[in-house]
Swiss-Prot record:
Any one Pfam family match given in the protein's UniProt record, by short name: Cyanate_lyase
Listed GO MF terms: cyanate hydratase activity; DNA binding
Catalytic residue positions: R100, E103, S126
EC number: 4.2.1.104
NCBIfam families given in the database record: cynS (TIGR00673)
Keywords linked to the UniProt accession: Lyase
Protein name per UniProt: Cyanate hydratase
GO biological process, one term: cyanate metabolic process
Length: 160
């Protein structure tokens, strides 16, 4: 199994905790799925903690500290603040997989908007009251497919 690692030269805007977490993850040879199971979170949410895009709870910090053998105080100091979200990727993204996700929004964004507006009315899908998951699906011919589910609370625009 190949593991996600971090090259800090390619991600200079990530918080200092990211490098610490990724080094420990590599040393322990753990996947995000394994770490997520240990801390009781979704694997995408767990990866978001590593990239500084999600807030870690005190319980998350305690479990990460034990699993990754990182002193609790060092992790708590770096992970207990509020994340500075949205700064980890330059726009448009250059990394091919992240660019494909960006391209999906470019190509289908207005189609998603139209269908969502027809189904729910004038509003937005929350990225705060939100969950996501990634699954692997294999078809009858043996082709692998990525299935990404986005689940956000619908927030109607207020009339004022």
């Amino acid at each position: 199994m190949s593991l996600a690692t971090l090259d800090t030269a390619q991600h200079p805007s990530l918080p200092s905790a990211s490098e610490t977490l990724f080094k420990a993850k590599a040393a322990k040879k753990l996947s995000f799925e394994q770490i997520a199971q240990h801390i009781g979170r979704n694997e995408v949410a767990t990866a978001a903690i590593f990239y500084g895009q999600a807030k870690a709870s005190p319980e998350d910090i305690e479990k990460l500290s034990g699993l990754l053998t990182i002193p609790y105080d060092a992790l708590e100091e770096r992970l207990s603040g509020f994340p500075d979200r949205g700064r980890s990727v330059e726009m448009p993204p250059k990394e091919p997989l992240i660019y494909r996700l960006y391209e999906i929004v470019q190509n289908y964004g207005y189609a998603y908007k139209a269908v969502l507006n027809e189904k729910f009315g004038d509003g937005i899908m929350s990225a705060i009251s939100f969950s996501t998951k990634v699954e692997k699906e294999t078809d009858a011919d043996g082709n692998n497919w990525a299935v990404i589910t986005l689940r956000g609370k619908w927030l109607p625009f207020s009339r004022f």
